[in-house]
Amino acid sequence: SFDYGAVHYVSLNTDYEELNGWRPTMMEDEAAWLDKDLAAAQKAGKRVVVLMHRPPWDSPYDGQLDVNGKYFMPLFDKYNVPLVFTAHEHCYGRTVPIKNDQAATEGTVYIATGRSGTESWDGSVKKPTDVVYYNPTDMPMYLTLQVEPDEFRVSALKNDGTLIDTVSVPAKAPVVKTTEAVKDTGAVQSGQKQKKDKKAVKKSKKQKVNKNK
């Protein structure tokens, strides 16, 4: 993960099938890291964009969460991640805001980024939560991301410049909780008492010196 301006970008490894034999706890470890990383970003007042290859649902879509969805989506919900980019299916799809794997008024928008190379895939299907779905079988495509003060503006275009989709995703910076100085009257009184005690000791010593004279 890294910061660029006011945005915190997180790149997740979702190739658990290829790595499971070598590191069976990969998803648990990555989810634990992600929890800490998003907490730090929230504390720093950063907006978040997540990048991951596999979508959080099975491919082709069958209504079930993929393994990475089971581990990562609860954390996206917990930290109010506004935008997640995925790939894998070589199609473009943009969901409504998602919370608890359900359409919601406020939640995470998931965008499948289409294809940039020559390979298309006719096995992808439109999800019930997709606002826009497009399978770029005719030519490659690309996306642009424009960061605005209170939103992320995403545009999807074909290589010839034809606009496929454009959307503004609400993305206000999280409110950073500041700890105000607490007035500890006890500590103040204690400090004042210590000052008085020191003055009393000095006065007592001075009186003893005068008596000795």
Residue spans for each PLM region:
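Asp/Glu-rich intrinsically disordered low-complexity tracts
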Residues: 178, 184, 194-197
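A composition/secondary-structure signal for short, hydrophobic, low-basic-content segments
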Residues: 49-50, 84, 188-190, 203
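Small-residue (glycine/proline)-centered packing/hinge motifs flanked by hydrophobic/aromatic residues
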Residues: 124-127
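Polycationic, low-complexity disordered segments in secreted or periplasmic proteins
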Residues: 190-213
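Metal-dependent phosphoester/phosphodiester hydrolase catalytic core
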Residues: 1-122, 132-136, 144-178, 182
